[in-house]
């Protein structure tokens, strides 16, 4: 059974709610850019299998633009993390790193952040698998991923 909320708890929850909503918006944008990077990586693998170097160069450029947008999202996240209370910062850092803790303390915004961070990590892992396979196929023993 939940204890009745004190006025201070309600005010903190509202303030955290606004912060968490903004962080969720950034994570949603990051997820969208990571999904596009994944799509472009898959497209690039297909272009490489057809030996279509012109298309590969164009796709690499588009992927680079999306990577820059992900960096911008990460920068915004870093700015938010540096301005939140230590307890919230620690929780957010763990969630973003994939070390998911309980989100019930942070309500529906917390659950959304956990879901977005998990989905982003899944897309990133899928993209890395495709990228690793392409890189090893092209570079062989000189692959960036050798011994990783």
Question: How should each PLM-predicted stretch be described?
Answer:
Residues 4-98:
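Extended, charge-rich alpha-helical scaffolding segments
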């Amino acid at each position: 059974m939940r204890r009745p909320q004190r006025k201070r708890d309600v005010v903190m929850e509202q303030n955290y709610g606004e912060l968490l909503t903004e962080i969720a918006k950034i994570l949603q944008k990051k997820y969208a850019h990571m999904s596009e990077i994944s799509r472009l990586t898959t497209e690039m693998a297909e272009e490489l299998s057809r030996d279509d170097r012109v298309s590969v160069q164009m796709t690499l450029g588009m992927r680079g633009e999306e990577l820059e947008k992900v960096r911008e999202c990460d920068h915004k996240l870093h700015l938010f993390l540096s301005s939140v209370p230590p307890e919230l910062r620690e929780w957010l850092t763990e969630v973003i790193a994939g070390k998911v803790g309980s989100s019930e303390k942070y309500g529906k915004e917390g659950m959304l952040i956990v879901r977005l961070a998990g989905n982003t990590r899944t897309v990133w892992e899928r993209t890395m698998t495709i990228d690793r396979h392409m890189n090893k196929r092209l570079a062989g023993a000189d692959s960036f991923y050798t011994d990783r």
